A protein has these predicted regions:
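Conserved ABC ATPase signature
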Residues: 142-146, 150
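Helix N-cap at the start of a conserved alpha-helix in ABC-type nucleotide-binding domains
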Residues: 178-180
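ABC ATPase NBD coupling module
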Residues: 66-82, 112-120
């Protein structure tokens, strides 16, 4: 559950990003925030995983006051929250599966990261995530050979591989054509309904 209780965010230059926001998102809910450009939608999302610090109020996620987290506790907290952005943030000159496996890197010993030695269970989980977004057949293709919609699905599969309880999607279909955008949104709905992940 995500609870904004009188949350405000004022940037150092004086710009108000959020002004006394009260909002509760229950476990497993699918919520869309709609508003004009500059209304604070991205600020609201980024406050949830503490990419932005709030300046007033209380923000709790699954009972944890986000503003109290730092260091290792903050990194661990963020592992439970997946982010999907408008830009896909893929390494386009490598394979789809390697992009998805990058979700496992924070939990790996340094030597495994250095050698690219992913565990069998990590590989199986990555393949399972690709299957959930209907692009398992693209696993060993280079990411730059995929369409925009397919690349966004790779980003979503990468997020699923980290086993999040919450997925925050910041304009995930803004760069896609209407037909592809609808397909990607259907993937989000399917994941929400089948896996109970809050989106």
């Amino acid at each position: 559950m995500i609870v904004f209780d009188h949350v405000s965010k004022v940037y150092p230059n004086g710009t108000v990003g959020l002004d006394d926001v009260n909002l509760t998102v229950g476990d497993g809910e699918f919520v869309a925030i709609i508003g004009r450009s500059g209304a604070g939608k991205s600020t609201l999302l980024r406050a949830v995983n503490r990419m932005h610090r709030i300046t007033a109020g209380t923000l709790t996620v699954n009972g944890t006051d986000v503003s109290t987290l730092s260091g290792k506790a903050l990194r661990q907290f963020r592992r439970g929250i997946g982010m999907v952005f408008q830009s896909f943030n893929l390494v386009t000159r490598t394979t789809v599966i390697k992009n998805v496996l990058s979700a496992c890197v924070p939990d790996m010993p340094f030597w495994r990261v250095l050698l690219g030695a992913f565990r069998r269970e990590d590989k199986l989980k990555a393949l399972e995530s690709l299957d959930k977004v209907s692009i398992l057949d693209k696993a060993y293709m280079r990411a730059d050979q995929l369409s925009g919609g397919q690349q966004q699905r790779v980003a979503l599969a990468r997020t699923l591989t980290q086993s999040p309880r919450i997925i925050l999607a910041d304009e995930p279909v803004a760069a896609l054509d209407p037909v592809t955008a609808k397909q990607v949104m259907q993937d989000f709905v399917h994941i929400n309904q089948e896996m109970g992940i809050s989106i």
